[in-house]
A protein has these predicted regions:
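Juxtamembrane and boundary regions of transmembrane helices in multi-pass small-molecule transporters
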Residues: 94, 106-161
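Short helix-coil transition sites and intra-membrane helix breaks within transmembrane domains
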Residues: 29-37, 69-82, 111-120
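Core transmembrane alpha-helical segments of multi-pass membrane transporters/permeases
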Residues: 9-38, 57-69
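Hydrophobic alpha-helical transmembrane segments of multi-pass integral membrane proteins
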Residues: 50-90, 94, 102, 106
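Hydrophobic core segments of alpha-helical transmembrane domains in multi-pass membrane transport
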Residues: 1, 21-27, 60-70, 88, ...
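Membrane-interface interhelical connector segments
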Residues: 38-56
Length: 161
């Protein structure tokens, strides 16, 4: 069945559209005020003792970890909008190609498996499915960990850093 224009208009989730639209200025402010650069400096300084050849992967792992942590307590759109300028600033400060870092943010923000809070669908099945918070941690943490490890090794192959 093909949707009519009216049906397609009615199926739009306006709350998500409004949330993303409202958060885009937050991402711009983070970038324009220098906050992204400041946070990027903190993140980059965490890898000063790491050998240079490992710094790109360690930074990528750190960006992914921070993003996945935030996406578990916030919406994935909000997390991506906040972390994207920070990840770009980290890459630029270190002289790396930012594409792998941006994709790390995109993948991590979309991998909300550890809590029912981070993603709407998780919340929808949480109550009716009779799940406990610990069920999400038990199943979601190993899955998120596997995604994290895969991202650290695959993203630099696709977008060399």
């Amino acid at each position: 069945k093909i949707l009519t224009p009216q049906e397609s208009y009615q199926s739009i989730n306006w709350q998500v559209i409004i949330l993303i639209s409202a958060l885009i200025p937050v991402g711009i402010v983070i970038q324009k005020t220098g906050t992204a650069g400041w946070i990027a400096g903190l993140i980059s300084s965490a890898t000063e003792s790491v050998p240079f050849e490992w710094q790109p992967k360690v930074l990528l792992a750190l960006i992914y970890f921070i993003t996945i942590f935030l996406t578990e307590i916030s919406s994935n759109a909000a997390t991506a909008i906040i972390m994207t300028p920070i990840s770009i600033a980290v890459a630029q400060q270190m002289g790396f190609d930012p594409r792998a870092f941006v994709f790390a943010v995109a993948f991590a923000a979309s991998a909300s498996f550890i809590t029912p809070v981070g993603y709407q669908t998780n919340l929808m099945v949480y109550g009716p499915g009779g799940y406990k918070f610990s069920d999400y941690i038990r199943v979601g943490f190993p899955l998120a960990f596997i995604f994290w490890i895969m991202a650290i090794f695959i993203l630099p192959i696709l977008w060399p850093i």
